[in-house]
């Protein structure tokens, strides 16, 4: 089995002579097997081996026993072990994320700290062939594309390596038994409350019994095949990207001609632009890419919010992807009515254009008897004579509005929650303020304070043109 692992390490260029390798050690069979194998191969591979264990403080006495076990194991193997205790429940609540996500982030943060402090070269993670099969099934059920079917990569970012991805769970358990390693068992892995556990404990055994007894190996071959296809496609993207995109001023301009490319290439060029602008690889979905493709035909000046503060703007058929500096945008008062009052009184119309907050058309007119107002959520009318100045900005801490029909104010945060506005979009919804009071959450609520009444003589109609209806 060691030869199998050595061959896999060499095939994927995981380790070179002199590398310092940190093993992520939970104390379970997979990580214990990985640590023991690398320990046995230290001299052959000319490497130094270290271990890191994070106690999530989630499982009480069991977690303490895990911690004691890994320390004793490392002592017996003469491997330096780093241990850290983290209150994952507390972090999960503070950051409003799952304990699973909080645990993963804290582990990788710890690994990164150790890597920098001790000049480590590689971080070894104990994913195995069964993990790969489970990952592919989960992603297929969610409707993944070919990139998703690549699954868990043997090497990521040249740092994270998975030397036992080639081994099945049964092989790992047998190895631990033969070598009297007595790994710890996380009882939560046996509970059918998580999707992955259901796939591991129910779906795969059912498929093995009724359809394909070698489904784990089959899915691993699929992952390998998809990885080769993705490599080829990505090479084409890297070749075409410099010809179809221009990097400038902290943004990327996707040329109009890019939209004539095959969809398989175009979608990946857009995805690459999004990643390069935002430096975040996990929060872009197919819908975001489709929205950008649709924006191409909406006309110049049109703009959409993507996510993570990223916007896309149509510039005469080209599409600019840029990251909004929300702090700067919040400080930027785009329009002050005192400066344009003469123009409004003279021409009754003013156009405001801003590449962060969008484009607006302001029209002042007399209120006609029986006039019906637009139901378009991006066109709103207000009592002009109640207004002395106008500001347009994004939200700030403590913002409130008196919603139409109400007497008391409500926090914007509560309104966004009630309207089911995604968290990542809330900081980038423009707000129109009259007299330093929020009058309109663009695309949504208007204020009771500035509503048109039977006493209104003049109305100001504001049309927001920077977001699609």
Curated annotation (Swiss-Prot):
Entry function: Ligates lysine onto the cytidine present at position 34 of the AUA codon-specific tRNA(Ile) that contains the anticodon CAU, in an ATP-dependent manner. Cytidine is converted to lysidine, thus changing the amino acid specificity of the tRNA from methionine to isoleucine.
**What are the record keywords, sorted?**
ATP-binding, Cytoplasm, Ligase, Nucleotide-binding, tRNA processing
Instruction: Give one GO molecular function term.
Output: ATP binding
Ligase among the record's keywords?
Answer: yes
Lineage top rank: taxon: Bacteria
Free-text note on domains in this protein's UniProt record: The N-terminal region contains the highly conserved SGGXDS motif, predicted to be a P-loop motif involved in ATP binding.
Recorded hits in SMART domains, A to Z, give: TilS_C
Name the major location.
Answer: cytoplasm
Signal sequence residues = none
One Pfam family linked to the record: TilS_C
Q: Name one GO cellular component term.
A: cytoplasm
Q: Which reaction does it catalyse?
A: cytidine(34) in tRNA(Ile2) + L-lysine + ATP = lysidine(34) in tRNA(Ile2) + AMP + diphosphate + H(+)
Locations listed in the record: Cytoplasm
HAMAP family named among the record's database cross-references: tRNA_Ile_lys_synt
Family, per the entry?
A: Belongs to the tRNA(Ile)-lysidine synthase family.
Note whether Transcription occurs among the keywords: no
Provide the protein name: tRNA(Ile)-lysidine synthase
Biological classification of the source: Bacteria, Bacillati, Bacillota, Clostridia, Eubacteriales
The cross-references to Gene3D superfamilies, in alphabetical order and at most eight, read:
1.20.59.20, HUPs
A Gene Ontology biological process term: tRNA modification
Residues recorded as binding ATP, renumbered to this chain, are 26-31
Q: What class of enzyme is it?
A: ligase
Q: What is its EC number?
A: 6.3.4.19
Note the InterPro entries from the entry. Answer: Lysidine-tRNA-synth_C, Rossmann-like_a/b/a_fold, TilS/TtcA_N, tRNA_Ile_lys_synt, tRNA_Ile_lys_synt_N
